[in-house]
Structure formats: structure tokens, C-alpha cells
């Protein structure tokens, strides 16, 4: 092998090595100037800009450590699948005045996006919650916002102490959350775990929620939402709604909550609509194989939802609820009201089914009871307490 050929061969190997390295598509933000003593926002944006242009799958790595990060928006479309691997603890500015109205970390318009890594997004919200309680601050940012994602996965991520919602999901399709964790104190205001709206085929599975508001809340135009093997508590339970508060809300169709456990929550499984509401539709909603442990209001349909008592309760909700089932719900209630089904006088409920309910209450007031208004569900199996019958302890 002559010298010229050896040199040529060596150059080819160097090219292939460089090409192979680029094809692995790993973009470590520390290579873009990120360090633990400064805001990593610019480094993350620069890494994303390059990764987004890659024609082969790429991974942005935020390595282990603790970093500060201001508001960041990662916006596609990108040329190939992209993974954001958060191994670190990311801390938001604690002073709410340092943040503009919007979200802390936003991911928009991506296909085949993955967020992973076992990291923590810490909203550092104590000062913001105090500000919110005093009503002296602007709208506070959510920790995470996912908009117009398709065929994407969020896994092994924790969101901690968000200033508002932990996660907002909007206009997404085929999005999965797995081993996703939400953590905030029970008294943290408006800290819904995941809020889903205008999205279809969203899966939330094997995940844990401890927060100050709904663990999972469902907004309008949600279709085919699957919630499986989720733990909730503290928090306000899993809620479809509140609905009917805005004009032109689209139907909620296909919500399936299965094999979930609620512990020390203010509610269990719930559908809630405003009185004097705009028209709306809730259809094909099923709560099955649910365990409640010391839960206030374990089973609820509330069409007179008015948390701040600033509603016209004389006018009925115009949200039509149909094809809803509560099946195999067992455990203990913190209040005597184990089952509460309050239907609107304005539009009839249809196809409401209650089966195999066994919820006990051990307070001095007496055993658990149900309350029913303007509703006559189909009953299957056993119900303890009796539901919507003459033998119910409280029924109207």
C-alpha cells in the first residue's frame, strides 16, 4: 500500500468517523456554553436549532446537575425525530416578576418528539403562590406546554412546584405520558397536573400526581383520552371539565379512566359543568376499577359547578351528558357523600350507568349516602351506598 493511498484511506476514515458522529445526532448543551452558574436558555435554543435541522434522529442532552433556565420555546417542525433528554434538575426563576405571561418550557409543532431522562423541572413557585393568593400578580406560567405535537412521548420526567398548571396539552394527537410525576403541596393554587384540551388519542399511564388542584383535567374538544394506572393525591381528583364556561366549546368524546387510585383527595372521579352555561356535549366517558382511600366526594356529576359562588344557579347548565359509566369503584370516603349525581334541569342525561360501587364512611353522622337530582341512572351489580333509589340515605 503506497503512501498516497494510505493518506487517502486515512482521510476517508476521518470523514466517515466525523460523518458517523454527526449521524448519532447527540447535542449536549454544555457544548453550547451551558454551565451550572448561568441561565441555559440560550444554549438550549442553540442546540435545538442545530438538532432540528438534522436529517437523522437527534438527541439534545441536558446532563446531570442543577441548572437555571428562563422561559424557552422549542418550535418545529423539525426534519427528523427529536429527543430532549433532561437528566438534570432545571430551576425556573422564583420571582414571578422575572417571567413574561406564557409558559416556562413550551414545545410546539413537532412530530415524533420524545422528552425523557429522569430529570426534574422545578418551578420554584412559593413566591408566585403567595402573589396569586394576594391577587397582585399577572397570569402565572405553566411549567410545561405541549402544542400541536403528534406521535410523541413524554416519559420519566418530574414537574415540581409549578406556578400554575404543571402541564398544558393543546391540539396534540397520539401523545403518551408514561412514568410522569407531578408534585406540589396540597394547598398550592391552580396547579392542575395535566390539562388536556383540543387533543385526540392522548395516553397517561403509570404516573403519579400530588398537587393542589385536579390531578388531570379535561377541557373541550378532547377525544379518546386514556388514563390508566395513575395515582392521585393530594389533589382534586380527575375531572372532566369544568365545561360550558365559554362559547363554541367542542364536544368531549371518549374519556377512559381505569385502574387508578385516589388517596386523600378532595374529589375522586368527576364531571363538572357550569350553571347558566353555553351549550356543550360530554359523551362516552367511563370510570372503571377505581380505588378511593379517604376521598371526599368519590363519585361526582356536578352540573351546578360554581366554586366561587358567582354564578346564576337559577339558570341550568346546557351541557348534555350521555353514555357515562361508573364501574367497580371501591374504598373509603372522607365525607358522608360517597356518590353525588346532580344533573342539569335544562338538558337530560342519557345512558348513565352505575355498577358495583362499594364505598364506606365511618364518621359519626352515619353510613355513606348518595344524593341524586334530576337523574335516574341504570344500576348494575351492587351499590353501597344505594344509589338514586328510595333506600338511599339522601335522595331527591
From Swiss-Prot:
UniProt-reported outcome of changing residue 343 to C: In clones G27W, G27X and G27Y
Coiled coil: none
Annotated disulfide bonds: 215-232, 372-388
Gene3D superfamilies tied to this protein: Single-stranded right-handed beta-helix, Pectin lyase-like
Keywords: Cell wall, Cell wall biogenesis/degradation, Disulfide bond, Glycoprotein, Glycosidase, Hydrolase, Repeat, Secreted, Signal
Residues with attached carbohydrate: 143, 151, 174, 181, 203, 208, 259, 294
Annotated catalysed reactions: (1,4-alpha-D-galacturonosyl)n+m + H2O = (1,4-alpha-D-galacturonosyl)n + (1,4-alpha-D-galacturonosyl)m
GO molecular function, one term: polygalacturonase activity
Protein name, per record: Polygalacturonase
Amino acid at each position: 500500500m503506497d503512501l498516497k493511498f494510505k493518506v487517502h484511506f486515512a482521510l476517508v476514515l476521518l470523514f466517515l468517523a466525523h460523518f458517523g458522529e454527526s449521524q448519532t445526532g447527540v447535542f449536549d448543551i454544555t457544548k453550547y456554553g451551558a454551565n451550572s452558574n448561568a441561565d441555559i436558555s440560550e444554549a438550549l435554543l442553540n442546540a435545538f436549532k442545530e438538532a432540528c435541522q438534522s436529517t437523522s434522529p437527534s438527541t439534545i442532552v441536558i446532563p446531570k446537575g442543577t441548572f437555571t433556565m428562563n422561559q424557552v420555546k422549542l418550535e418545529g417542525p423539525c426534519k427528523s425525530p427529536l429527543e430532549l433528554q433532561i437528566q438534570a434538575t432545571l430551576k425556573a426563576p422564583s420571582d414571578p416578576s422575572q417571567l413574561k405571561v406564557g409558559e416556562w418550557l413550551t414545545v410546539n409543532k413537532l412530530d415524533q418528539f420524545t422528552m425523557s431522562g429522569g430529570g426534574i423541572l422545578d418551578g420554584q413557585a412559593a413566591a408566585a403562590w403567595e402573589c396569586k393568593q394576594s391577587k397582585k400578580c399577572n397570569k402565572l406560567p405553566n411549567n410545561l406546554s405541549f402544542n400541536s405535537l403528534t406521535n410523541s412521548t413524554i416519559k420519566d420526567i418530574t414537574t415540581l412546584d409549578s406556578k400554575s398548571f404543571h402541564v398544558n396539552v393543546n391540539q396534540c394527537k397520539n401523545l403518551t405520558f408514561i412514568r410522569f410525576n407531578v408534585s406540589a403541596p396540597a394547598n398550592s393554587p391552580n396547579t392542575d397536573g395535566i390539562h388536556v384540551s383540543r387533543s385526540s388519542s392522548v395516553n397517561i399511564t403509570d404516573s403519579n400526581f400530588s398537587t393542589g388542584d385536579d390531578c388531570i383535567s379535561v377541557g373541550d374538544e378532547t377525544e379518546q383520552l386514556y388514563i390508566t394506572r395513575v395515582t392521585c393525591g393530594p389533589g382534586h381528583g380527575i375531572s372532566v371539565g369544568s365545561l360550558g364556561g365559554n362559547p363554541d366549546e367542542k364536544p368531549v368524546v371518549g374519556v377512559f379512566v381505569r385502574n387508578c387510585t385516589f388517596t386523600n383527595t378532595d374529589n375522586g372521579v368527576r364531571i363538572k359543568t357550569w350553571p347558566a352555561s353555553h351549550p356543550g356535549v360530554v359523551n362516552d366517558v367511563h370510570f372503571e376499577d377505581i380505588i378511593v382511600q379517604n376521598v371526599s366526594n368519590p363519585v361526582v356529576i356536578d352540573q351546578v359547578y360554581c366554586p366561587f359562588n358567582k354564578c346564576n344557579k337559577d339558570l341550568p347548565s346546557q351541557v348534555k351528558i350521555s353514555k357515562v359509566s361508573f364501574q367497580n369503584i371501591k374504598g373509603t370516603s372522607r365525607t358522608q357523600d360517597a356518590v353525588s349525581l346532580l344533573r342539569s334541569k335544562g338538558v337530560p342525561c342519557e345512558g348513565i350507568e352505575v355498577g358495583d360501587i362499594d364505598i364506606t364512611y365511618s364518621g359519626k353522622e352515619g353510613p355513606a349516602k348518595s344524593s341524586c337530582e334530576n337523574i335516574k341512572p341504570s344500576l348494575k351489580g351492587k351499590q353501597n351506598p344505594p344509589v338514586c333509589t328510595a333506600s338511599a340515605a339522601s335522595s331527591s
